[in-house]
Amino acid sequence: EKCDVAACVGATWIAGGFAGAEELLAQSLKPGGIMLIGEPYWRQLPATEEIAQACGVSSTSDFLTLPGLVGAFDDLGYDVVEMVLADQEGWDRYEAAKWLTMRRWLEANPDDDFAAEVRAELNIAPKRYVTYARECFGWGVFALIAR
């Protein structure tokens, strides 16, 4: 049965990106229904591919800028009718919560096969975030209605 609202928030990679997620979600929506897409974007395009990789992505092409993302929704035939963008403080809280989670996991699982890998990530994640990703990444949830 078709629904009034369909959402993919933070997992568009499952469908190969926001365009693939849009295609899947559209199958579930009633005409005039609202689609919610949560997607990262570049607040500031990294100057080099190396900086993009330091942000934890493969390439600058992994994400669009905010104007590029809104334009891509338009190109797919959607009106953006609302958006909620994470501010930098909110993004900081999101990232920092991961560090605490890793720390607590390491305390509870010191002998786990993945402990060394998690420790290595925790050792570099805060500095990597504040050096590269914090200025480059944005994230938003976009409400879309098909034209």
Label each region the model flagged:
Residues 40-60:
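Short, glycine-/aromatic-enriched active-site segment of Class I SAM-dependent methyltransferases
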Residues 8-11:
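A short beta-strand submotif of the Rossmann-like class I SAM-dependent methyltransferase core
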Residues 35, 40-45, 85-90:
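Short "lid" loop at the C-terminus of a central beta-strand within the Rossmann-like core
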Residues 1-6:
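A short acidic, Gly/Pro-enriched loop at the edge of an enzyme's catalytic core
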Residues 19-34:
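A short glycine-rich, Lys/Arg-flanked "PGG" loop and its adjoining helix->strand segment in the class I
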Residues 61-83:
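Short alpha-helix
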Residues 13-15:
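A short His-aromatic
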Residues 82-147:
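Conserved Class I S-adenosyl-L-methionine
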